[in-house]
Amino acid sequence: MYKCIYFLFLVVCVTFLSACGSNEEKQEEAGNPVSVVDFTGKTVSLSKPAKRIVALAPHLVENAYSAGAGHLLVGAVKFSDFPEAAKKLPIVGGYQKTNHESIVELKPDLVLAWESGNSHSSVELLRDLGLNIYVNQANTLVDVAKSIRDIGALAGTEEVAEKTASSYLTIIENVRNKYKDSELVTSFYQVWNSPLQTISGNHIISNAIELCGGKNIYADELAIAPIVNMESVVTRNPEAIIASGMSAARPEWLDQWKDWNSLTAVKKNNLFFVNPDHIQRHTVRLLDGINRICTQLELARARR
C-alpha cells in the first residue's frame, strides 16, 4: 500500500512540476492581501500574491515548484538543479554568498531565505533594502509541508500547495505506522569524514531515521551537526552506518569504516549510502531518501 500511495504521489508531483515549470496553467490574478508567519516567527505580509520570487537555497526552489509557484521564480542560487526547469533560472550567487545587487535588479516581491544557510547579515541587508523576506528552517519532516503551504499562500497557489503537502504528510504517516513497532536499529549518520561529523536528534535527517525505526546514536547531542571522534563511535557501536556525502556518487570514505571491524555495522556489512539530494534537501524528495533508509534498516534487521 505504501508503494502504491508513494507512486501516486510522484505522479501528482510530476504533473504539478511540469505544469508549473512550463507555465501552462494560468494563475488567477488575485489582488487580495496574503500573510503567513515564517519559521522565525515573523509575519510576512504582501498586499497581493507574489508574482516575482527569488529563492536563496536549492531546496526552496524545489518547494516553490511543489507549491505550484515555480513559474513565478525569477532568480535562484547555484546548485538549484531540480526540477529541470530550475536550471534555466538566473543565478544570484550561492546560498552562503548571494549577490545583493543581482537580487534587487530582479525586482522580486518575495525572497525565500534559509535561516541556517544564508548569512543573517545578508538576509537583514535585503530586508533593509525593502524586500519582503520569508525565512525557512525545516527541522522536522512536518516542517516541509509548512514550507510548501506557506509558499503557496504567498504566491496565491494554495490549491496546488495543499494537495502536495497533504499527499506528502499522508505518506509520512503511513511510513510511521508501518515501522512504529519495529525493533530499533542503532544508526550512525555520517555527514562528513574529516572532521568526522554527524547529526543530533534535532536534525531533520534524524527525524527520517527514527521514522524508519532507527535510533540515532547521537540524538542526545546539543549541537545540530556535532563533530565526534572515532573512539566515541566505536563505544556506541551502531548497527548501521549511513552516509550521503556531497554528490550522487557513493563517497569512498564510507568504505574506510571497514578498517574498524569491531563495529557491528562493519561485521554485518551495514554500510549504506543515500543520495544527498534525497535526504539533505528539505523537500518532498525526502520521501525517496526515507524509502531508501527504511529499506536499508530492514536489511540490517534481517542480518541480525
Show which residues each predicted segment covers.
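Bacterial Sec-exported substrate-binding components of ABC uptake systems
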Residues: 2-6, 19-59, 158-188, 237-240, ...
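Bacterial N-terminal signal peptides
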Residues: 7-16
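Short helix-initiation/N-cap motifs at beta->coil->alpha
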Residues: 37-41, 90-101, 221-230
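Extracytoplasmic substrate-binding proteins
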Residues: 42-43, 109-110, 120-197, 218-220, ...
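A short, structured surface patch at a secondary-structure boundary
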Residues: 52-106, 110-115, 217
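Short secondary-structure boundary segments
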Residues: 57, 115-116, 191, 221, ...
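His/Asp/Glu-enriched short active-site or ligand-binding loop at hydrolase and phosphoryl-transfer sites
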Residues: 77, 202-225, 273
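Short helices/loops that flank or line small-molecule/ion binding pockets
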Residues: 100-107, 129, 228-237
